[in-house]
C-alpha cells in the first residue's frame, strides 16, 4: 500500500516538476533494478529531497530535518504531505542519538531491498561549494554491502526564492556509476574502508555536480 501511494504521489507531482523546472536527468541506467542501494547526493536546497524521488525510477527513502514537519506555511504543509508520502525519516540535528537512529533506519530499509538516499555533507550548502562528506553513506555501504550510487545535482538552489517564487534556470540530475564496497580489500578494517569509500563518494559527487570543493585553493592563491 505504501509503495502504491508513493508512486501515486509521484505520478501526480512529476508533470508539475517537468512543467515548471524541466530537469535534465541522465544516468538512470545506473540505478539497480532490484535490491538495496544507497543514493549519495550533494545538497544545494531543501527542494533536493523533492526532486530526487521524482527524478529516480525506483522508490527511495531519506532523512530530512524534523523542522520541515513543523512549518506552518502553505509550503510547509505541502512539504510535510510529500515527505510523509515518500516515508522520509525525520532527524533532530541537535541530537547525536537521532543521527545514529536515522542511519540504523536506513540500514533496515536497505536490508529490505529498498533504496535509501543520504546527503554526505550533512546539510545543504549555503555557498554553493561541495563541503567535506561525513561517513554516513560509507557506513551504510560497509554494513549492508549495498552499492552507493553517486548523484550530482546542479541548479536546484535557484528554483525558489526566499518568498517561494519560482526562478528559471537549468536544473540537472546526474546519476553516476555504482560504487561497490566489494571493490575495497575486505581484509582492511571497517574504519579504513569507510574512509576510502567516503573519499571516493565525494570525488564522484564532485565530478557529477561540477562544484568547487570548500577549502580548495583557487589559482594564484
Annotate the PLM regions.
Residues 25, 76, 100-103:
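Structural motif corresponding to alpha-helix initiation and N-cap regions
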Residues 21, 96-100:
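A conditional alpha-helix N-cap/helix-loop micro-motif detector
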Residues 11-43:
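Helix-to-loop junction immediately C-terminal to a conserved catalytic motif
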Residues 18-20, 57, 83-85, 143, ...:
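Short, well-ordered coil/turn elements that cap or connect secondary structure elements
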Residues 27, 64-65, 87, 119-121, ...:
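A secondary-structure boundary/capping signal
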Residues 33-96:
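Catalytic core of membrane glycerolipid acyltransferases/transacylases, capturing the structured
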Residues 4-5, 35, 100-221:
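Non-catalytic C-terminal accessory region of glycerolipid acyltransferases
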Residues 2-21, 80, 84-87:
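Short hydrophobic helices that act as membrane-entry/anchoring signals
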